[in-house]
Amino acid sequence: SLLDDKVLFKSDGMPTYHLANIVDDHLMEISHVIRGEEWLPSMPLHVMLYRSFGWDAPEFAHLPLILKPIGNGKLSKRDGDKMGFPVFPLEWKTEEGISSGYREKGFFPEAVVNFLALLGWNDGTEKELFSLEELATTFDLKRVHKSGAKFDPEKNKWFNHQYLIQKSDEELAKQFLPIVAEQTGKIEAIEINKLTKIVSLIKERAHFVNEFWELSNFFFEEPTAYDEKAAKNWKEETPQLMKNLIEVLNEIDDFTSNTIETIVKEWMIRNEIGMGKIMQPFRLSLVGALKGPHLFDIVEIIGKEETIKRIQKAVTTL
């Protein structure tokens, strides 16, 4: 008497959601139904349907809602579209447009699962990173909070970064390879060992593999422009200093990072040349900016010939 009458079949004979859901779960032998709290009002009806069929009902649990990052209310697709983060696992196309998915954005599945598991739950400690195996053994519905949890897009990215830096350089290099091939059009010329070294230098600064190219394009292509603010460090005496540096580099046979750094710095000390007079123009010549990995690691990877070529171009351009 406390429940209103529910329509179980439409006028065309098709079952409504309530009936179809019960039959589907029973046929699939679902043992636990875990869903959002908005389905709590439907639970008595579903239990009655199970009893009417003479079936054992599964265990029911209702989770608090995932809330908007800003403001009040349930997280929606529009929130993701407006703020630039995915809501769906895969790209979702509608008449209104395309909503990018977690896969297309570059999220690792295990990172997303970890992030979502901690929305309204914890294991009683400060621990945040859980493998799938740990979650399977540790997760307990009794520790799920009753109030909703706000969705934090930046925390979501943080989780992906944590999983990214834990992956081996070799694995990430294989994922990065098709991106480099697409950008350069030279898949045959790409050495996986070189790519692995590059990944080791840049992954700490990335949240996603698809950010690697922006962080490393100078390893594959010479700068086409120079940062205007950084170019102000290019003084009147800089061209001659860079020409002298080329002579020093030309004499180095063991062209490895440590050796190059030692020889260049010894030359600077002997000639009483300040660090800023060489290092900043040197980096600007190779990268086009003053940011990036350790300078001499860059020099080793791009090689002597390319290093000298870029310095010469900067001397004639800046």
Please provide the spans of the model-predicted regions:
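Charged catalytic carboxylate motif
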Residues: 45, 111, 241
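Long, amphipathic alpha-helical coiled-coil segments characteristic
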Residues: 229-260, 264
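Helix-rich, typically C-terminal accessory recognition domains appended to large enzymatic cores
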Residues: 256-301, 306
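A short, ordered amphipathic alpha-helix with a cationic face
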Residues: 36, 145-149, 165-170, 234-236, ...
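Catalytic adenosine-cofactor/nucleotide-binding cores of aminoacyl-tRNA synthetases and other
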Residues: 54-225, 287-318
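Active-site cores that bind ATP or allylic diphosphates and position pyrophosphate for catalysis
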Residues: 1-82, 86, 98, 123
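Short, charged/polar micro-motifs that form catalytic or ligand-binding hotspots
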Residues: 36, 102, 268, 272
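Generic structural signal for isolated residues within well-ordered alpha-helices
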Residues: 48-49, 134, 266, 297
